[in-house]
């Protein structure tokens, strides 16, 4: 199945479908367009050279190399992450299983519907090999402020979540978790490397390849047919 991006159809939580200045801020300092004329200093002789950089794409080499390494990874299965209890988990344990990877939050307007539907989908398909990997993130409106134990208690007590929940991560900016660098580099869509909001979703096939990316406004139930296709493949 070739990767595709399910486009945004409606605004959510007050954010328009097009990237806003707020979401643009999550790009961090590594990616910027510039139309100014700049001076470049040669460190060997101290000479400044005036040059035009109109429409030049500026990329900090350090951040670029991090993204390049993530893109070079062959699949999701090449990564090791920490679970909600701080234990290392090699994602190769999920080989042969379709995955839905979601950045979650406990205090979002999308929390109740997403957690409820995710739990129902997991209960329905877990015995067929389907897995949901939830990554808490506090980058969107500060809506996941709790500690890992608090997040775990919330998800497992209120929504009876049985799917794996992992350590809190950044999904945008210079501290982006390696797994999310990989997901975004393989499923850019029109948003490029920006995660728009809580509950954005990546569907991964049995070989660890990203095959679909869904905006936060796509409910888990809307993804069910795509999950069934991967289970049958």
UniProtKB/Swiss-Prot annotation:
<keyword id="KW-0934">Plastid</keyword>
<dbReference type="InterPro" id="IPR029760">
    <property type="entry name" value="GPX_CS"/>
</dbReference>
<comment type="similarity">
    <text>Belongs to the glutathione peroxidase family.</text>
</comment>
<dbReference type="GO" id="GO:1900367">
    <property type="term" value="P:positive regulation of defense response to insect"/>
</dbReference>
<keyword id="KW-0150">Chloroplast</keyword>
<dbReference type="InterPro" id="IPR029759">
    <property type="entry name" value="GPX_AS"/>
</dbReference>
<keyword id="KW-0560">Oxidoreductase</keyword>
<keyword id="KW-0809">Transit peptide</keyword>
<dbReference type="GO" id="GO:0004602">
    <property type="term" value="F:glutathione peroxidase activity"/>
</dbReference>
<dbReference type="GO" id="GO:0009507">
    <property type="term" value="C:chloroplast"/>
</dbReference>
<protein>
    <recommendedName>
        <fullName>Putative glutathione peroxidase 7, chloroplastic</fullName>
        <ecNumber>1.11.1.9</ecNumber>
    </recommendedName>
</protein>
<comment type="function">
    <text>May constitute a glutathione peroxidase-like protective system against oxidative stresses.</text>
</comment>
<dbReference type="InterPro" id="IPR000889">
    <property type="entry name" value="Glutathione_peroxidase"/>
</dbReference>
<dbReference type="Pfam" id="PF00255">
    <property type="entry name" value="GSHPx"/>
</dbReference>
<dbReference type="GO" id="GO:0006979">
    <property type="term" value="P:response to oxidative stress"/>
</dbReference>
<feature type="transit peptide" description="Chloroplast">
    <location>
        <begin position="1"/>
        <end position="69"/>
    </location>
</feature>
<feature type="active site">
    <location>
        <position position="108"/>
    </location>
</feature>
<dbReference type="InterPro" id="IPR036249">
    <property type="entry name" value="Thioredoxin-like_sf"/>
</dbReference>
<dbReference type="InterPro" id="IPR013766">
    <property type="entry name" value="Thioredoxin_domain"/>
</dbReference>
<keyword id="KW-0575">Peroxidase</keyword>
<dbReference type="GO" id="GO:0005886">
    <property type="term" value="C:plasma membrane"/>
</dbReference>
């Amino acid at each position: 199945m070739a990767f595709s991006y399910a486009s945004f159809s409606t605004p959510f939580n007050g954010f328009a479908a097009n990237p806003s200045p707020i979401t643009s801020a999550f790009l961090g300092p590594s990616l910027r367009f510039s139309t100014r004329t700049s001076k470049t200093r040669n460190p060997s002789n101290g000479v400044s050279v005036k040059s035009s950089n109109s429409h030049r794409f500026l990329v900090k080499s350090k951040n670029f190399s991090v993204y390049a390494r993530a893109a070079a990874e062959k699949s999701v299965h090449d990564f090791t992450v920490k679970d909600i209890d701080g234990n290392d988990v090699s994602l190769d344990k999920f080989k042969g299983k379709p995955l839905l990877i979601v950045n979650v939050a406990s205090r979002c307007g999308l929390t109740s519907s997403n957690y409820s539907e995710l739990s129902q989908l997991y209960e329905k398909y877990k015995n067929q090999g389907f897995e949901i990997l939830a990554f808490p993130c506090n980058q969107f409106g500060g809506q996941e402020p709790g500690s890992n134990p608090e997040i775990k208690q919330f998800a497992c007590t209120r929504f009876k979540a049985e799917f794996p929940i992992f350590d809190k991560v950044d999904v945008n900016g210079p501290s982006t978790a390696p797994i999310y660098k990989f997901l975004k580099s393989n499923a850019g869509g029109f948003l490029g490397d920006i995660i728009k909001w809580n509950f954005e979703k990546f569907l991964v096939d049995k070989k660890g390849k990203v095959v679909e990316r869904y905006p936060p406004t796509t409910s888990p139930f809307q993804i069910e047919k795509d999950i069934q296709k991967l289970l049958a493949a």
